[in-house]
């Protein structure tokens, strides 16, 4: 059975970089998928779905639920790796509930933990506005993305805490410290 770890955090928390490094360090057993990268790749294809995704992401809004869930599940099932890291998911209560429902309806994948990389809003803002990745990285859109992240956060945290799946990692440290702690935690689950 595949082990799934969801990695959440504010825009600029470092969740994608952390997950990339962990999967690179453990390439035999760990696959990493960034929800954002999966959606950007689909958007770049300029298909009907891609254009729809672009319409939402360019405004900092959430992509429709069915498109995101379909994209996530496809990535998990197509992977040959035993441990799957997905960052940037869930970003809404609806996404959380939809994934929970899908995972409960199958026996190929088990959710082991939801890891939250916690950073202050100031740190997130400095990191996002200091990088240039596309049209979505300006101050107005950053604030919208923070709102989209923060609005459902307490409910998402409480849902996973009740299932004893929520883990917080301090994202205000060096990348080496964060990756080390997260990697040790993930690998502690064994088989």
Swiss-Prot record:
It catalyses: AMP + ATP = 2 ADP. Pathway: Purine metabolism; AMP biosynthesis via salvage pathway; AMP from ADP: step 1/1. One of its GO terms (biological process) is AMP salvage. AMP binds at residues 35, 40, 61-63, 88-91, 95, 133, 145. Residues 130-136 are annotated as: LID. ATP binds at residues 12-17, 131, 173. It is found in: Cytoplasm. GO terms for cellular component: cytoplasm. Keywords: ATP-binding, Cytoplasm, Kinase, Nucleotide biosynthesis, Nucleotide-binding, Transferase. Its EC number is 2.7.4.3. Residues 34-63 are annotated as: NMP. One of its GO terms (molecular function) is ATP binding. Catalyzes the reversible transfer of the terminal phosphate group between ATP and AMP. Plays an important role in cellular energy homeostasis and in adenine nucleotide metabolism. Monomer. Belongs to the adenylate kinase family. Consists of three domains, a large central CORE domain and two small peripheral domains, NMPbind and LID, which undergo movements during catalysis. The LID domain closes over the site of phosphoryl transfer upon ATP binding. Assembling and dissambling the active center during each catalytic cycle provides an effective means to prevent ATP hydrolysis. This is Adenylate kinase. It comes from Helicobacter pylori (strain HPAG1). The gene is adk.
